[in-house]
Amino acid sequence: MSTSHFVIDAARLAGRFEREPFAVRHQLTAHALLQLPRLIELATVLPESSVEYNQADLPIEQEYLATPRNGLTIDQTIRQIEDCKSWMVLKNVERDPQYKALLDECLEEIAPHVRTISPQLEHREAFVFISSPQAVTPYHCDPEHNFLLQIRGNKVMTIFDRGDPRVISERHMEAMAFGAHRNLPYTEDMAALGRPFPLAPGDGVHVPMYCPHWVRVGQAVSISLSVTFRSLVSVRRDAALRVNARLRRFGISPVPPLQSSWRDHAKQAVDRALGFVERAARPASRG
């Protein structure tokens, strides 16, 4: 008989999912796949493109292209994480069948409670974050539905309202829908606009798509698991954002996503057609 990974509050999950951030609880802190020795093993077999790491004593407003490397290899970084002042993420760990099974187990527990917004949980991905004490993850947002689960150590994630143009603009979301990097502009006068979520082992938080956030780790090594997915809502939202970006080029001020269902459906059809035309126009590769 399988053990539940989440402590589900059905009313909270159904009522708040994707509408606002909220705290969750989980039972994964002792899971063998999420302990440092197993993660060291995983980091050495993942493709290099699936491991991102850098110095972690960063400002909240760090620009992506200026992010300093730590001068170490992947293996050195994860083995010395206690002292090397670094931040690391193991991306798409579901490539490994054991981690894929864990991801699916987690999301199948969530699925029955979010079907009104997300009938299907698609494009499932899992990420493991391993950070030195006092590491900072700069201000950024992500385009997926996300549940961040704290496994080891403590951190504070400060999350902002994606509907507030003072913290993220429609133009930034439109750029991300085309694949722009996740880091966003940040100024000190935005600090009071965020909501801090302190996370200890067993704690977690739901981060709705495109809600900006930044993270500061406590006095010990931190390990966190993110289980993420896309939905019909997220796919439609990204399509509308891409079409809106194109409309701006013609001087049109478009209606943001999720404010008009028929507009969003129409924009999704336009986005699909434009994607087909662009793919057809690409020169065929020669072998």
Residue ranges of predicted features:
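Transition-metal
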Residues: 1-108, 242-250, 274-287
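A short glycine-rich, His/Asp/Glu-containing loop-to-beta-strand
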Residues: 22, 123-129
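A short beta-loop-beta micro-motif enriched in histidine and acidic residues
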Residues: 123, 136-146, 192-193
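Conserved short histidine dyad/triad with adjacent acidic residue
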Residues: 127-141, 160-164
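Double-stranded beta-helix
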Residues: 150-206, 211-212
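Ligand-binding loop in jelly-roll beta-barrel domains
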Residues: 154, 211-225
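A short hydrophobic beta-strand segment most commonly corresponding to one strand
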Residues: 170-171, 219-235
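Conserved double-stranded beta-helix
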Residues: 196-198, 231, 237-287
